[in-house]
Structure formats: C-alpha cells, structure tokens
C-alpha cells in the first residue's frame, strides 16, 4: 500500500452527517476537486477540525495513540470504523475519540482512513505536507492487515 495524498476543504454539509442521504453531493464535489488537483481525497474541515474524508473516517496516530473523532451527528458512523476500533482495542492500542486539527495532522506520526471500499488506507500527506516520514506508517499497515485477516475469518 503506497498511501494517499489528501487536501482539505471546508465542510459545507448540514449538521446531520451521520445520516447517509443527500449528504453525498458535497463529498462527491470535494473528491472531484481533489482528483483534479492531483490528490487522492479530501479531508473536510469545520471550525479548524477534521470531520472526515469524502467517503471515509479519518484518523491520526501520535506517540502510538490512535486519535479519531467521537461518534456524533458530525460524522458517518462507519461500520469499518467500528470494526477497526474493536480490533485496535483487542490489541491493547490506546484510542482517543476527539476532534483533531489540521495542524495536529501535520504533526502526527501517521494518518489513515477507514471505509468499506478501501478498508484501512494510510494517508501520507495533507495539503502537500508529509505526515511523519511521508511513507505509510507501521501502525496503519498493521491495522490494515488485521482488518483484512479478521474480515476473511468472518466471511461466510
């Protein structure tokens, strides 16, 4: 996995982002803007904090701690997010559920997203600034492998 480059844009969706309905227009436009600008995706920002990606939940890792936004009306309650956090807890990884800023992303050791279509995908830069050393992080890659293995075990 080579990792994604993301850009940021204001989050212009209404405040019930946990409901998967007509909320898809703005993320679709943001994803298109990212691709046209040479990025892989967009992380949306409200009041200085990351809400989520265009079709994924956002995470950073700092000093071994996984940081992701807490469940609320501000984000979609992703099924991959729920599984990933359970697997991380099973492995005694520390998780903080709270908002985080763009500056925190730039200072993070690692970042990644989760979604049903991409599983766990490392993020290696934001707005042209490398995250960590600019390569997929070891925790993100480990969590990706764990997610795939656990999903295969549970497959019918």
Q: Could you describe each region identified by the protein language model?
A:
Residues 1-156:
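Helix-start/capping segments and mature chain N-termini
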């Amino acid at each position: 996995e080579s990792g994604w480059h993301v850009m940021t844009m204001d989050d212009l969706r209404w405040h019930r982002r946990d409901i998967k309905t007509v909320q898809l227009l703005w993320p679709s436009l943001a994803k298109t803007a990212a691709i046209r600008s040479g990025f892989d995706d967009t992380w949306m920002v409200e009041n200085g904090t990351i809400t989520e990606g265009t079709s994924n939940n956002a995470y950073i890792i700092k000093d071994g701690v996984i940081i992701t936004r807490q469940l609320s009306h501000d984000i979609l309650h992703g099924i991959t997010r729920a599984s990933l956090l359970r697997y991380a807890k099973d492995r005694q990884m520390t998780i903080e559920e709270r908002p985080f800023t763009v500056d925190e992303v730039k200072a993070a050791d690692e970042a990644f997203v989760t979604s049903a279509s991409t599983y766990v995908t490392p993020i290696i830069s934001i707005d042209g600034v490398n995250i960590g050393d600019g390569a997929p992080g070891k925790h993100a890659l480990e969590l990706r492998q764990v997610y795939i293995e656990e999903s295969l075990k549970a497959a019918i």
